[in-house]
Amino acid sequence: MITTSVTEAAECLQQGQVLAYPTEAVWGLGCDPFNEQAFQKILELKQRPIEKGVILLAGHISQVEHLLTSLPQTTQQEIIDCWTNHQPSERATTWLLPADQHIPSWIKGEHPLVAVRVTTHPLCVALCNAFHGFIVSTSANPSGQEPAHSLQDACQYFGSQLNYLNGDLGQSQQPSRIINALTGEVIRP
């Protein structure tokens, strides 16, 4: 199914299906992070090892606040400021945060932290809000291939194996940078 309806796309996620959708820079694959079967389908489609982990994408700070509480107040504020002051033309930032007991182990892979990004991309914000929480976000491509930059690219990779939320990419030219919130280390510049 190809849709432009955020409501239909959120229903696909709620039904345990995989969805391709445009993000800030490239097309992503998403699912309900708490649905292991849907998550395994993404790994199968991407031919990606589970050890690598994936990003959780949220539409609002309130969807991830519980993951910030163990951090020092100054670090919490830095992360919130980074997400809330993000400009559409700027590169997005994903933070590695301490995972709480509610984050499934398959999301983190072999890592002790969970990768989280609060997006300002309008379609992604609407999707996360319609889904009422964060979703899995990993680039829409088989491992070793270039990420999809259009609906056509995503369809060429995956055909009818999943659903598509059609819309515009954001203005960023690069995937998000990744920063470890505990150490400040930039993992992906």
From Swiss-Prot:
Enzyme kind, highest EC tier: transferase
Cell location: Cytoplasm
Keyword set, alphabetical order: ATP-binding, Cytoplasm, Nucleotide-binding, Nucleotidyltransferase, Transferase, tRNA processing
Domain of life of the organism encoding this protein: Bacteria
UniProt GO cellular component terms: cytoplasm
Main location class: cytoplasm
GO MF annotation: an example: ATP binding
Domain spans labelled YrdC-like: 3-189
Alphabetical list of Pfam families matching this protein: Sua5_yciO_yrdC
GO biological process: regulation of translational fidelity; tRNA threonylcarbamoyladenosine modification
EC number annotated for this UniProt entry: 2.7.7.87
Catalytic activity: L-threonine + hydrogencarbonate + ATP = L-threonylcarbamoyladenylate + diphosphate + H2O
Family stated for the protein in its record: Belongs to the SUA5 family. TsaC subfamily.
Entry protein name: Threonylcarbamoyl-AMP synthase
Annotated organism of origin: Acinetobacter baumannii (strain ATCC 17978 / DSM 105126 / CIP 53.77 / LMG 1025 / NCDC KC755 / 5377)
Gene name, Swiss-Prot/TrEMBL: tsaC
